[in-house]
Regions:
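Short secondary-structure boundary segments
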Residues: 34, 91, 115-117, 138-139, ...
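C-terminal alpha-helical cap/extension of soluble enzyme domains
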Residues: 165-168, 173-202
Length: 202
């Protein structure tokens, strides 16, 4: 299982050093929570900060950008150019999801779809052959420190079944990532459900 620390847990005044220490410890998949103050109430960082972080850390770390922004189809290229390897967009915030994830992959990044707790899994299933990752939010996005929502189990299991069938039919494998309330006491449970990537610290 991939453990992806959320960079928002770091002191943003010392972000480069904090991320460097994470990478040195073997945690080279870094989760970047990008918030625009519109899709979610909070505001974090954008492409200029990410580009500086990439320059400081080099090419080794995987930058996994979770775009909590409106109209991500109009801005994702900036994050690819800044050095992000993975770009995940919210199904609720993109007008043409299939077109958006296809454009992300055409730009050279892996594409992901994010599902809020209240968003049905079918939103991701519609584009499953075109994506590399589904990020299931197990808290409501935009704020840290929330408790894990356990009823995401049904969504995860349904998604895992669809991915397994897609692979059996010769299609692409798709990672299941979970973000929100992931702790030592529930990470084994998530793995048993079929999760392959956990964001921690959010």
């Amino acid at each position: 299982m991939i453990i992806a620390p959320s960079v928002l847990t770091a002191d943003l005044a010392d972000l480069g050093n904090a991320c460097s220490e994470a990478v040195k410890s073997g945690l080279n998949w870094l989760h970047l929570d990008v918030m625009d103050g519109n899709f979610v109430p909070n505001l974090t960082f954008g492409p200029p900060v990410i580009a500086k972080l990439r320059k400081a850390l080099g090419e080794e770390p995987i930058f996994d950008a979770h775009l909590m922004v409106m109209n991500a189809e109009e801005s994702f290229q900036q994050y690819v150019d800044a050095g992000c390897n993975h770009i995940s967009v919210h199904a609720e915030a993109v007008k043409h999801l299939h077109r958006c994830v296809t454009a992300i992959r055409d730009a050279g990044a892996s594409a992901g779809v994010v599902l809020n707790p209240g968003t049905p899994v079918e939103a991701a299933l519609e584009v499953l052959p075109e994506i590399d990752l589904v990020l299931i939010m197990s808290v409501n996005p935009g704020f840290g420190g929330q408790s894990f929502i356990p009823n995401v189990e049904t969504k995860i299991r349904k998604l895992k079944q669809a991915i397994d069938q897609q692979v059996a039919d010769g299609g692409r494998p798709v990672q299941i990532q979970v973000d929100g309330g992931v702790k030592a006491h529930n990470i084994a449970m998530l793995r048993d459900w079929g999760v392959s990537n956990c964001v921690v610290g959010s």
